[in-house]
């Protein structure tokens, strides 16, 4: 099956604003820092120093935190905050508080904390960028050593956020230029784009966040081994799993389920030749899988994006929100992709074949191997071996019935069932021609004499369905279970014994 996907939302790891509140007992009460971390464990996994100081803002900056949450919609809010945005909010509350200008605060909420909802898909985010940028210009905050600053590069505007991680914020139309600036500073970034992707005269009304990648490893357990999958694929797989949970919840009608992505290729840019040479076998396999899973048809406004879903994986998924459930689903999804898209791993219960050769699995952690091509070669060799084994099995089996038939001169083979059907037809014809009173002798033995003095039996039968040899020369029928060939002295199997006549006629 396929589900639609859009380009109008971020692929970032997010949590809902409502998660800051006690959802079980009192929704107007902010939870403690320990409860918040426990209930949203996935966003803190492999996060390094992103969230240092979280406990302090839940204790010492609680009033400022309340103001931000109220602006974001409070306990009933549908908005979400990204992983990087939460990190920036912690740093902001450690040093600053909200402005008296409501417009500036609204811009801070979106540009710095990356709190967003579906309303941003309709546009207006570039205006928020301009509001905050002009405010920083008025305050002459152009020093990148500060938490918030502004700058220009090749006449393109950007906002620089220097927190526990670094984020460049710019209009989507300027993203490539600002990414060039980040690369010149050795900042390896990933992009999240939020806003409307409908093009107008000034470009798309969307804002791009270029955040420096984490130094920590993002790992997954695959086929009993641990591999580093990197932050980008970790984010992508999280979005995939969350979307597939929606498919599982709406298994009878998944037409309304959509995956929100931000590029034609999905969430991770496809590897070029240089990237493939540097990537591990697992990353190359995931890159190959993306080319299969993330489909695009058409161009411009007619472009249709979709994501391929396998029903056999939906049946394997666990439904839940806990950290362990999410991690387990991510691990299962990677294994599923390796089997179905790359032919690596153990054969799936749905019948999809794969190769789990140990040397092939070792290549997943190594660089410089085209693991997908190697898997195809291994699968081809497996198929050849299976065909060879089938041929050997055929040669070792018993010879066919046709090959075991021995026919003498003037003889032809006829199966017992075919012979009986012909016999019944001939018997019916003969009975119709005879008188109503039958000869008792003929009842036990029905023999015709040809002009040459030979005798032909009209009702040769054999109980077993292995067939009999019907000789066109003389044949005597002694009873319904015994066939005796006078010319060849050959007789068929019998269940009723030999008659005395047969015993006297049998050759030595």
Swiss-Prot record:
Basic and acidic residues compositional bias, start-end: 455-464
InterPro entries attached to this UniProt entry: VP5/VP6 (IPR026373)
Region listing for Disordered, in residue ranges: 424-464
Coiled coil: none
Listed Polar residues bias regions: 424-453
NCBIfam families, A to Z: seadorna_VP5 (TIGR04231)
Name assigned to this protein: Non-structural protein 1
Organism encoding this protein: Banna virus (BAV)
């Amino acid at each position: 099956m396929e589900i639609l996907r859009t380009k109008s939302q971020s692929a970032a790891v997010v949590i809902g604003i409502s998660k800051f509140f006690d959802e079980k007992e009192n929704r107007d009460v902010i939870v403690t820092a320990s409860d918040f971390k426990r209930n949203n464990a996935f966003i803190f996994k492999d996060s390094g120093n992103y969230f240092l100081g979280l406990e302090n803002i839940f204790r010492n900056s609680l009033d400022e935190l309340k103001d931000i949450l109220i602006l974001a919609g409070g306990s009933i809010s549908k908005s979400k905050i990204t992983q990087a945005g939460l990190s920036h909010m912690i740093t902001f509350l450690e040093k600053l508080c909200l402005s008296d200008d409501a417009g500036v605060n609204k811009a801070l909420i979106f540009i710095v904390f990356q709190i967003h909802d579906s309303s941003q898909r309709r546009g207006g985010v570039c205006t928020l960028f301009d509001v905050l940028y002009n405010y920083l210009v008025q305050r002459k905050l152009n020093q990148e050593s500060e938490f918030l600053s502004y700058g220009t590069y090749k006449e393109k505007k950007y906002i620089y956020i220097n927190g526990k991680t670094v984020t460049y914020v710019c209009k989507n139309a300027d993203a490539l230029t600002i990414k060039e600036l980040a690369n010149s500073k050795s900042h390896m970034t990933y992009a999240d784009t939020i806003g409307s992707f409908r093009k107008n005269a000034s470009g798309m009304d969307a804002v791009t966040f270029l955040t420096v990648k984490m130094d920590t490893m993002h790992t997954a357990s695959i086929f009993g081994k641990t591999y580093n999958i990197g932050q980008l694929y970790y984010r992508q797989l999280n979005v995939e799993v969350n979307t597939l949970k929606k498919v599982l919840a709406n298994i009878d009608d998944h037409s309304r389920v959509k995956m929100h992505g931000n590029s034609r290729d999905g969430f991770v840019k496809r590897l070029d030749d240089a990237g493939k040479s540097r990537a591990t076998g697992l990353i190359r396999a995931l890159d190959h899988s993306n080319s299969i899973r993330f489909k695009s048809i058409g161009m411009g406004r007619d472009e249709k994006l979709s994501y391929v879903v396998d029903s056999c994986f939906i049946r394997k998924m666990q439904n839940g929100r806990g950290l362990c459930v999410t991690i387990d689903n991510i691990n299962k999804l990677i294994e599923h992709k390796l089997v179905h898209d790359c032919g690596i791993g153990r054969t799936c219960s749905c019948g999809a074949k794969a190769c789990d050769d140990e040397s092939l699995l070792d290549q997943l952690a190594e660089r410089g191997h085209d693991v997908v091509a190697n898997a195809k070669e291994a699968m081809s060799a497996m198929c050849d071996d299976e065909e060879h084994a089938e041929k050997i099995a055929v040669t070792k089996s018993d010879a066919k019935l046709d090959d075991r038939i021995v026919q003498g001169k003037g003889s032809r083979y006829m199966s017992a069932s075919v012979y009986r059907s012909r016999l019944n037809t001939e018997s019916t014809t003969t009975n119709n021609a005879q008188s109503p009173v039958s000869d008792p002798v003929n009842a036990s033995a029905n023999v015709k004499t040809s002009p040459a003095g030979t005798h032909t039996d009209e009702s040769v039968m054999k109980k077993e369905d292995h067939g009999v040899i019907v000789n066109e020369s003389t044949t005597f029928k002694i009873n319904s279970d015994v066939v005796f060939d006078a010319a060849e002295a050959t007789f068929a199997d019998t269940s009723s014994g030999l008659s005395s006549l047969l015993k006297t006629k049998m050759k030595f």
